[in-house]
Amino acid sequence: FKDRMKDHPVIQIQDEIGDSSWFGFSLVIRPGLGIKRSDLLNKLKDAEIECRPIVAGNFARKEVAKYLEHSVFSDLPNADYIDAMGLFIGNQHYPIPEVIVKVSDFYKDIS
């Protein structure tokens, strides 16, 4: 996955720090391309690739945050961007090379 996606023209992937469990793959649309997340979601759906929102995104804006004791020092523009332009594709317990190829190639008619 990392090898196919590291220089992707539309999608940024996470920078791994340490050893990731890779339960899934986060995908974030690169800034400045004029591509909407809804366009990306539709192309993934057409390719029969299931996806979900990134769990946290900007957690400070989630409804549950009002129940937690917390403080936010300032705006969180990166978290807002991930919340608006990111998504998550689940991994499997068996190899899925054909899905990884589909994910890395789907953008050709969206960009």
Residue ranges and their predicted role:
Residues 1-111:
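PLP-dependent aminotransferase class I/II
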